[in-house]
Amino acid sequence: MSPNRWILLLIFYISYLMFGAAIYYHIEHGEEKISRAEQRKAQIAINEYLLEELGDKNTTTQDEILQRISDYCDKPVTLPPTYDDTPYTWTFYHAFFFAFTVCSTVGYGNISPTTFAGRMIMIAYSVIGIPVNGILFAGLGEYFGRTFEAIYRRYKKYKMSTDMHYVPPQLGLITTVVIALIPGIALFLLLPSWVFTYFENWPYSISLYYSYVTTTTIGFGDYVPTFGANQPKEFGGWFVVYQIFVIVWFIFSLGYLVMIMTFITRGLQSKKLAYLEQQLSSNLKATQNRIWSGVTKDVGYLRRMLNELYILKVKPVYTDVDIAYTLPRSNSCPDLSMYRVEPAPIPSRKRAFSVCADMVAAQREAGMVHANSDTELSKLDREKTFETAEAYRQTTDLLAKVVNALATVKPPPAEQEDAALYGGYHGFSDSQILASEWSFSTVNEFTSPRRPRARACSDFNLEAPRWQSERPLRSSHNEWTWSGDNQQIQEAFNQRYKGQQRANGAANSTMVHLEPDALEEQLKKQSPGAGRVKKFSMPDGLRRLFPFQKKRPSQDLERKLSVVSVPEGVISQQARSPLDYYSNTVTAASSQSYLRNGRGPPPPFESNGSLASGGGGLTNMGFQMEDGATPPSALGGGAYQRKAAAGKRRRESIYTQNQAPSARRGSMYPPTAHALAQMQMRRGSLATSGSGSAAMAAVAARRGSLFPATASASSLTSAPRRSSIFSVTSEKDMNVLEQTTIADLIRALEVVHTHAVLDEQQQAAAAGGAAGGGGISRGSRKQRKMGNAGLEPPQLPPILSLFAGDQTRTLQAAAANRLYARRSTIVGISPTGGAATAPAARSLLEPPPSYTERAANQSQITAGPSNAPTVQSKFRRRFSVRPTALQIPPGQAPPPGASLMEQSSQTALQRRLSLRPSPLARELSPTSPPGGSGSALPAGAIDESGGTSAQRLLPLPAGTRPSTSSTHSPLSRIVQISQAQRKSSMPSAAATGSSGAPAEK
C-alpha cells in the first residue's frame, strides 16, 4: 500500500472513530448525569440516617465512623458538597477511547454501554470498524517492514564500501525476528512505561505490564490510563498531550506487531521450510503405510499360526454330508430330474473324452469315498471339535470366532483380480477371451460346495428326444465358418423342417406367414377395391415432396410385400422328402430356409428367383420341372398360396411396370406375371407391326450366372434366371459351402465381377455383329454412341454393386477391349446373332484360355482384307492368391487305384469354379483388325469389329500352349481334362463360327 493511500485510510479511520465517539457521548453522557443525581440523593439519605443513629456520639466519633464506612464501601457516605466538581466518566475523549478499543479489539472493559441503544449501536459499529482497523495496521506493518529492510540494506552497503572483505551474514528466521524485536521492544514497551509511571503514579513494573498487555491486544482492563479524577487539575495542559500520546502509541505499537507477524509468515514460506514440511508429511505417510502393511502381514501370520497351533492339534468333527453330493449328476450339466413329478432313474454316465473309463468304473464298484479337506472350515462342527482340547480350553471361544470369520471370507478369484489390475489382453481376461471355447459353465457360475472335476466333458446317455416340429440342435455351436454361424444354419434347417411338416399335414390349406402387425393390418383394412392392380408406385423421394397426399390403408402392407417380385397365382411345389435330422447331411430333395435377421423364413411364395424353398423360402420353378412335378397351373393347393386380391393389391416395382428400364437392367428378381404378360404383348405387337424402339422389342438380356439356367415354363420366352447355390439336386452339391476353398470363392467373385462389367458390351457386340452381317435390323437393340468416356481407362465397380441394378454402368468398346486384355471370364458369350439364341448361348461354359508370354510378331495376327493398326498389350496380374499344396480337399481322397473321373469328390459348383484360370498366370492380349462377323478367325485371334466385338481369345495351338495345371487349386486335374476335350473339339467350333452360325466359345 502506498503512503498516500495509507494516509487517506488513516484519515477515514480517525473520522470514523470521531463519529462513534459523538454517538456514544450523546447516549452515555446524559445517562451518566441522571445516575449521578440519583446517587447524590442516596448519599444524602444515608448520611442523615447514620447521623441520626450516631446522635449520642460526639462529632469526632461520627466523622471517624463515616470515613471507615466510605473506605470500606468505596463510596462516600459523608455529606456531599454543595458543588460537585468530580469529572464525568463519559467525556468525549473517553468516548473516543472506547470506540478505539472496540475497533482494535483490545476491550479493556472499564467502561461499557449501559443502555439498550448503546449496545445495539456498538454491534453495528464494530462490523465496519474492525476490518478498517485491520487494513490500516497491515499497511502500517508493511511500511515498517520496508523501512527496516531499507535501513539494513543501507547498513550493508556502508559496511561493504568501507570494508572490501566484508561478507554480509545470512540471517535465519529466528535471527531476523530477534533483530526486529529489539528496536520494537525499546521503542514501544520500555520508553512508554516511563511516561505511564509519571502520569498515572504506577510502579514501572505495572506500567511495563500495561504496555505489553495493550500492545499484544490482550487488554485485561485492570489498569487503564487517563481515568484519574485529579489528573486534569494536577497536570493541566500536559494532560491533554498525554491523552494524544496514548492514542498515537496505541496505533503504532499495533502496526509494529503486525510487522513482526509478517516477518514470521515470510519465513514460513521459504523453500527450506517447505522442503522440511514435505519431508515430514512424506515420513508420516510412509510410516502409516508401514504400519498398515505390517498389521496386514501380521494378520496373515496370526491366521497361519492359529491354523497350525490350534486347529491341527484337535480332531475335526464334520457336519452331515451336503445333500448336493448325493445327487446323481455332475457339476457340468443341469439336474434334468428336478422338474419331474416322478424321480427319474439314475442314468449310466457316458464319458465323452476320457481314457480312464475302466478305472472309474472299478472305483465306482468299490465305492467312492469323499475326502473332506481341512481347509473347508464351513463344514466343521465348532463345539464338538474344540470341546476336547483340554490344554486350550480357554481359547475355545476365540477359535470358534476365528473359524467363523475365516469361513465367511471368500477371496475373489485370482484371474479376475489380475485382469482388474493389469487389464488382460486388450482389456479382456483369459476367461473372457476363451469364453466361446467353453461348452459348460464357467468357474464363476459354480455354486458352493464345488466337487473336483474328474473329466473334461460328459453327457447323459439319455434317449434322444423325439422332435415333432423341428430338427434337434445336438450341440451349442460357438464356432463360425465363412458360410455363416452353424447355429443359424441349424435353425434354418429347423424352419424348413417345420414347413415340410405343415405342408404334409395340410396339403389343401392356405398358410400365410406374415408379421403379426402386417397380418392385423391386412385383416382390418380389407376394401372392395383391393383387387385393383397398382399401375405405378411413386418413389419415396417424390412422395416426400407431397406430404399431404392421402395414404391408402394397405400401403404399409404392400411396401412390406414388394421387396421381391412375386408372380400372381403361382402355387408352391409339392412336399419333398423329409430331412435326415440326425446328421448334418442335407438330402437332394430338401431345401434351404432363408433367415432374415434371425426372425425366421419369409412367406413361402413361389417365384422364378434363385432361392429354393420347400415351404420356408422361395421356390424355383425350374426344380419343380426337374423333380417331375406337375405344372403350376395344374396344382390345386400348397404350403402357401396368396389370394388374388391380396396379391394384386401389393405394390409392384417400377422396374416391372416400365418395360424399357427392365429390358436394360439386369435384376436379381423377375417381373410379376401381370407385368411379364404385358411386356410380351408389347414386344409381340412391336415385332409384328415393325414400329417402336428396337430396344423395347429386343428380349431383356439378364446378367449372366455361374450356373446354367434351369428349364421352366417361362424359359422359352424370357431371359434365363440366376440359379441359387441351394437349388442343386445332387447330394455332393449340397455340401458346397463346406467343401469350397477360399481360392475358389475368390475366383468365383472375379468371374461375376468381370461378367457384370461386360454385360452391356456383350449385348452391344451381339447387336453390332448382327447389323454388320446383314442380320436382323429392327429387332436388335440400338448401339450406344461412342463418347469421350471410352477413351479413358474404365473404373470397375465394386463387387457389391453387382446386385444393386445400377443402370449407369456403361463402358465403351475400347475400354471393354482394354479390360479384356487385363481380365478374362469363363462364362460363355453369345456370338453375333439374334436375341432368340441369346439365352441358350449365354448359359454355356468354356474352359479358360492359355496364358503365355508371346513375342510381338506372334501376337500380331491379322484376318480379313483390311489392314488396321494393331495394339500390342502386355500385362501382369496385379493380385494373386497364395497357392496351397492340397490337390484334394481333406477327407475326400479316393481309394487307391480309383480313377479321378469315376470317383471325384468335387461338386458341380467346384467343377464350374475350377475352370477359372489361376490369378498367378499372365496373359498377352493380341489384337486383330476389324472384319465382318462372318469371316473365319484363326486360333488365338480376336474379332474386335470396330471396337464393339465381344469375341473371346482362343487358346494357342497345341505346340505353343503351355500347361495350365496349377498347384494353387484342388481342381487342376479336372481343368486339364476339360482343356483336352476342348482341344479336340476346336476345329468344329472354328468351322461353325466361320459359317456365320452361333458358335460356342
Curated annotation (Swiss-Prot):
Q: Where are the transmembrane segments?
A: 7-27, 120-140, 171-191, 244-264
Q: Which residues lie on this side of the membrane: Cytoplasmic?
A: 1-6, 141-170, 265-1001
Disordered, as annotated region:
591-668, 768-795, 830-1001
Where in the cell? Membrane
GO biological process, any: locomotor rhythm
Question: Which GO molecular function terms does the record list?
Answer: outward rectifier potassium channel activity; potassium ion leak channel activity; protein homodimerization activity
Asked if the keyword Transcription belongs to this entry, the reply reads no
List residues, modification Phosphoserine. Answer: S332, S373, S562, S565, S685, S691, S715
Q: According to its UniProt record, what is one Pfam family this protein matches?
A: Ion_trans_2
The entry annotates sugar attachment on N58
* Organism superkingdom: Eukaryota
What is its membrane topology?
Answer: Multi-pass membrane protein
Compositional bias (Polar residues): 855-873, 961-983
> Which intramembrane spans are annotated?
95-111, 208-224
Q: List cellular component terms (GO).
A: membrane; plasma membrane; potassium channel complex
Composition-biased stretches (Low complexity): 832-841, 911-926, 984-1001
Q: Does the keyword Transmembrane apply?
A: yes
Tissues where this protein is expressed: Widespread expression in adult, strongest expression in muscle, brain and ovary. Also present at low levels in larva and embryo.
Q: What else is known?
A: Inhibited by barium.
Family from the record = Belongs to the two pore domain potassium channel (TC 1.A.1.8) family.
Q: Any idea what this protein is called? A: Open rectifier potassium channel protein 1
The beginning of the lineage is:
Eukaryota, Metazoa, Ecdysozoa, Arthropoda, Hexapoda
